[in-house]
Structure formats: C-alpha cells, structure tokens
Amino acid sequence: MRHAKSAYPDGIADHDRPLAPRGIREAGLAGGWLRANLPAVDAVLCSTATRARQTLAHTGIDAPARYAERLYGAAPGTVIEEINRVGDNVTTLLVVGHEPTTSALAIVLASISGTDAAVAERISEKFPTSGIAVLRVAGHWADVEPGCAALVGFHVPR
C-alpha cells in the first residue's frame, strides 16, 4: 500500500510531512476495503515517515506493526529484505510505503504465472496515494524474491 495523500506544510522535512485531510479520509476507506476484501492482516511493515505511520493509524488495522527506517526512500530489493524477516506465523502482511518503490515492488514480485496482466498494466501507469496492490505469495516470507508472487488485484480507495 502506498501511503495516503500528504500535506506540504512549509518548513517541514519530507520525512515528517503529515497526511492531508483527503489522506485521512482515504486511509480510512483503504482500511475498510482491506477488512472487507482480504483475509485479516496479521502484521504490518511500515515506513517510519509520518505520513506512512498516519496512514496505518487511520486504516484502523490493529495488527502488530514493525516500523522500518529503511523503507523510506528504499529500492524494491531493500523492501524485499525487510519482508524476508517476517515470521512464518504471518499469513497476511500489509506493507505501507512510498512511490516509486511501491509500484516497482509489486511489478518486481509479480510472476508471469498467476498475475493479472491488466492489473500489472494499471500499476505500471500510475500508483496513486492510498493505492493497494494485492499479491499472493506461496511459501515462506524468507523466500520472497523477484517473480515469486501472483499480482491479483489493485484498488485505489476514493
């Protein structure tokens, strides 16, 4: 999931930017969509940026969260390394991050087999704030690598 729409207050460092009112509303919508359409989230991996943390808070998802500084400005490989650290007791993981990493990660993880080509194309064109890519992974989180997942959905709450 990409963080929700952020504000741009003067004098605030990028890492510390808060959500805009629209972002607060859309993060809530994202949480509602996640609860209605996917299995319960067991764990969250979230950027330490204020807007990412606030996005998670406003989704209402109350799963245990690990905040990783490395997710801010990360390359897809760095996010994969963080995913590889997730325990096998987790079946549904929510990753809250930033662009352009979130879209690149979804495309990098997507395999040809099982991936919805139309979804991949939509993500390649634009991954708006609060966008949620849904990937299915078989096996252990420690084994997640490029091409290991089926990209099966994409939702932008509005």
Swiss-Prot record:
InterPro entries: His_Pase_superF_clade-1, His_PPase_superfam, Mito_Ser/Thr_phosphatase
E.C. numbers: 3.1.3.-
Similarity-based family: Belongs to the SixA phosphatase family.
Name of this protein: Uncharacterized protein MT1313
Keyword Heme attributed: no
Source organism of this protein record: Mycobacterium tuberculosis (strain CDC 1551 / Oshkosh)
Keywords: Hydrolase
Keyword Cytoplasm: no
Enzyme class: hydrolase
Top-level taxon of the source organism: Bacteria
Molecular function GO terms recorded: hydrolase activity
